[in-house]
């Protein structure tokens, strides 16, 4: 027992940089994949998606184990992560043991466990994992057994509780079995309940593990530092993200009527979810870079932002931003190369708008064309989700979006009037004065809403559109100005009009 404590202390110690443990983890699982590919009987069938699929499996599993051990021990997440990441060095043992036994017993190695079509009873497999039944190879069983013992020792070392130690081993095994070994049963069950096609293709498996990995990762980050996560979430500018997400859904609805494609499998659902997720991450990156450039202005207009309060150190704040950028690119790529291209365009346009050296937001009025362009890009992202070419997007709608949102996006400068004025940024409110600019921007909204039914060729929307436009005109000019009320009314009106459009298109 003492030597186990020494191993844990060594792995938890801060003498080695954390990225050493990350590289150790990836080196271990890469070695596992390499050895497995070399010895399996159907190695000739290995394709590009196999290492991707398997690596994502291990990444999501590693994160899930960290969460489990944190909930049981309440140890610091970073310490747990160091131990768990290094512990994956046992994974290459599996193919090594199976290869040795193959030489002795001459049996065929096949890593095909818990296949729905070949599994008699999932509960029996769970209860008799170490028993005499077809499924996991001896190497896998040995690996799980060793991992359960290690988990039990770690929990006991941290809690000094035999009960928690036993519970930790059982919960670890249950997590691995029900959360990962039985994943095909979960996919099959969800697809049956939703009336979707049964699909366990490599794309579905990759999407599934990406889904598990990102949510586990975010939960690990939350447990690591709640203050950082809370600060980022509070500064997420929810109303603006919702605007862009609605543009994606609007584009999806525009592309639906003559595409004939809808959600046919679980993978289709996850693809559109990943588009939504990539937009969120792209906006987080853009918001963080904008905050870094706007510290002087935000000290006056937005003193509660993390860049002003200092709740997150600058170095960490930058890391969070580029991590969000990384996830935005990864998850947009899963939805297709066109989505990836459009997300990169979205990020680039926002960078040109808010960041030096160009910092185009300093150009009065017309700089909002960058925001309008990003709105159009999100429309195209939803539209192209159906596999349609963006060149077939209705040109009248594209022109309407560019003109209307260029004019209406000046709304965001009302709240920042004092900060922009102090910083010498010539926005419409700074040039014309707050009262006059609010009236002009309100008129932009009223005209835009009144024009929407004409552009969309939906005359039955004239009455509600005009009502919403007038309501926004009044809300913008109410004293004192309430940013949340205006954006809430905008989102409510947009959701209502969008809901009508979707319902009409689906019923065609």
Regions found by a protein language model. Give the residues of each.
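Multi-pass alpha-helical membrane architecture of UbiA-family
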Residues: 1-508
